[in-house]
């Protein structure tokens, strides 16, 4: 890896496509949903997760083993990409991988809010961003949310969280804090992003991700029951929505889907839009948005094969694989029917 000099997209994309071909598909998922946690762990041991399952097998078992192995493998895969990348390409990928810093911050905050144990929170952390082990340990050691805000002062999340904490204390829900984390992440992604040929499609993808994040946030707020205005939590940088229209769209999913279908995204989304129209719950709608974003990234990657978007597309696809396997393991441990679990997966 080098942060200076020229980029090397051809080399990195070739490596990433080889990794993409090793991701689980329909056949593997059909097998997994009919296995118990111990069988799932053994299945993973014969796949790309072999090293992690073997390394962790003496300390963990069942769903705990699966989750720790998934998160360690995810971090390794993305750190490998950074090791391969040079120059501007490295910078673009590193910025995007800060999404896992954002994920970890929100996971710790949610854990404190819900009263989860340190072990439960740690099992959900993904060490693929810029936070080092010392900072993550300090976050895990925090006994209350205000302490997390203090620990993060000096990071890209510090100022936004400090400003949002007072509102959180007033409303008693996590929306202000989580939105502050998301805003900080997307602001640093777009900050000083020079739209040359290498970054043009990358910016188009980021705009789509922000648009879908705004849609997701508005729906969550509308269904939270809290006295919150979606306009106050609008994230700048997208192209599809105006802040003032989100409140009305959030109460009418059909209009929201129509807005997406009639936009530039409609031409590049097919199955995902049908899933959005068929979604009958917030969870179902969010799952369909995940699938739509993945399909959009895939399409950009095919149209512009030497841009950064095939790499971002792989990052999303790998995340979905980890989410799917985790959902299967937790569902099987809870005794859910295989068909019910399969319906919850995001597969393209």
Swiss-Prot record:
Keywords: ATP synthesis, Cell membrane, Hydrogen ion transport, Ion transport, Membrane, Transport
Lineage start: Archaea, Methanobacteriati, Methanobacteriota, Stenosarchaea group, Halobacteria
Cellular compartment(s): Cell membrane
Molecular function GO terms recorded: ATP binding; proton-transporting ATP synthase activity, rotational mechanism; proton-transporting ATPase activity, rotational mechanism
Assembly, per entry: Has multiple subunits with at least A(3), B(3), C, D, E, F, H, I and proteolipid K(x).
Pfam families assigned to the protein according to its UniProt record, in alphabetical order: vATP-synt_AC39
GO BP annotations listed: proton motive force-driven plasma membrane ATP synthesis
Main function: Component of the A-type ATP synthase that produces ATP from ADP in the presence of a proton gradient across the membrane.
Native source organism of the sequence: Haloferax volcanii (strain ATCC 29605 / DSM 3757 / JCM 8879 / NBRC 14742 / NCIMB 2012 / VKM B-1768 / DS2)
Membrane topology of the entry: Peripheral membrane protein
GO CC, any one term: plasma membrane
Protein name, entry field: A-type ATP synthase subunit C
Family in the record: Belongs to the V-ATPase V0D/AC39 subunit family.
Alphabetical list of InterPro entries matching this protein: ATPase_csu/dsu_sf, ATPase_V0-cplx_csu, ATPase_V0-cplx_csu/dsu, V-ATPase_V0D/AC39_subunit, V-type_ATPase_csu/dsu, V-type_ATPase_csu/dsu_dom_3
């Amino acid at each position: 890896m080098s942060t200076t000099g020229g980029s090397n997209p051809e080399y990195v994309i070739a490596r990433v496509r080889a990794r993409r071909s090793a991701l689980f598909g329909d056949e593997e998922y059909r097998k997994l949903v009919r296995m118990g946690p111990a069988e799932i762990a053994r299945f993973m041991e014969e796949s790309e997760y072999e090293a992690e399952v073997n390394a962790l097998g003496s300390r963990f078992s069942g769903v705990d083993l699966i989750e720790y192995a998934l998160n360690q493998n995810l971090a390794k895969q993305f750190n490998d990409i950074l090791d391969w990348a040079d120059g501007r390409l490295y910078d673009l990928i590193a910025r995007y991988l800060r999404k896992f810093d954002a994920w970890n911050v929100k996971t710790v905050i949610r854990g404190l809010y819900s009263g989860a144990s340190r072990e439960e929170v740690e099992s959900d952390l993904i060490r693929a961003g810029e936070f080092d082990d010392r900072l993550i340990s300090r976050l895990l050691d925090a006994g209350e949310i205000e302490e997390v805000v203090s620990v993060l002062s000096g990071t890209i999340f510090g100022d936004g969280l400090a400003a949002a904490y007072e509102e959180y204390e007033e409303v008693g829900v996590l929306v202000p804090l989580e939105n502050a984390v998301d805003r900080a992440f997307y602001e640093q992604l777009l900050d000083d992003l020079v739209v040359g040929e290498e970054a043009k499609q990358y910016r188009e993808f980021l705009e789509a991700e922000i648009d879908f994040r705004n849609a997701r946030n508005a729906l969550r707020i509308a269904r939270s029951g809290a006295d919150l205005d979606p306009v106050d939590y609008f994230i700048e940088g997208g192209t599809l929505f105006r802040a003032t229209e989100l409140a009305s769209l959030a109460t009418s999913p059909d209009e929201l889907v129509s807005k997406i279908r009639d936009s530039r995204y409609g031409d590049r989304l097919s199955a995902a839009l049908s899933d959005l129209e068929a979604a009958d719950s917030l969870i179902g709608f969010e799952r369909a948005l995940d699938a739509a974003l993945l399909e959009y990234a895939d399409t950009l990657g095919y149209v512009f094969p030497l841009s950064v978007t095939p790499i971002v597309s792989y990052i999303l696809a790998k995340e979905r694989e980890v989410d799917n396997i985790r959902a299967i393991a937790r569902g099987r441990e809870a005794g859910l029917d295989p068909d019910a679990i399969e319906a919850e997966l995001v597969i393209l």
